[in-house]
Amino acid sequence: MSTQVMNETKERMQKAISAYQRELATVRAGRANPSLLDKVAVEYYGAQTPLNQIASITVPEARMLVITPYDKTALGDIEKAIQKADLGVTPSNDGNIIRITIPPLTEERRKELAKLVKKYSEDAKVAVRNIRRDANDDLKKLEKNGEMTEDELRSSTEDVQKLTDEYVSKIDEITKDKEKEIMEV
């Protein structure tokens, strides 16, 4: 029974790490990356539509994104949505495609982004710790219902703690890599 709790816990912690990595992908480092535009939603035929569903996003150069809409009439709406998203970039529309040149990051902006990464890191760690708490509660219920002994509970709780430590150190590692990427000039 405790293996089921452990498997669920591991799965939930892995999902927390994946969510953290998706969140980090939207933080702009010095290079162009299509995931920078993941949170951009375009008003398209009256509905908020994710940009990557109505246009292809390519990276022809290290500091440039090119957005080619599937429907040319959406060009203006896409441009407005990018400006409204406040990403610190300026789109240029040539009538067929939109080019976004990624400016090099200033030292001040790098520090802001590093702070943001730290905040996301803390949020991910809190999520992992909450999962640990839930797992420990589940294990205590099993012990209370007589489905496991006190020794098994202690052992399982230690396993959950080891798992938590492992995932928290993974988060720290990912954070360190992202901060290094941001601080790279």
Swiss-Prot record:
SUPFAM superfamilies: Ribosome recycling factor, RRF (SSF55194). GO terms for molecular function: ribosomal large subunit binding. Gene3D superfamilies: 3.30.1360.40, Ribosome-recycling factor. CDD domains: RRF (cd00520). The keyword Oxidoreductase does not apply. It is found in: Cytoplasm. One of its GO terms (biological process) is translational termination. InterPro entries: Ribosome_recyc_fac, Ribosome_recyc_fac_dom, RRF_sf. Keywords: Cytoplasm, Protein biosynthesis. Belongs to the RRF family. This is Ribosome-recycling factor. It comes from Bacillus licheniformis (strain ATCC 14580 / DSM 13 / JCM 2505 / CCUG 7422 / NBRC 12200 / NCIMB 9375 / NCTC 10341 / NRRL NRS-1264 / Gibson 46). The gene is frr.
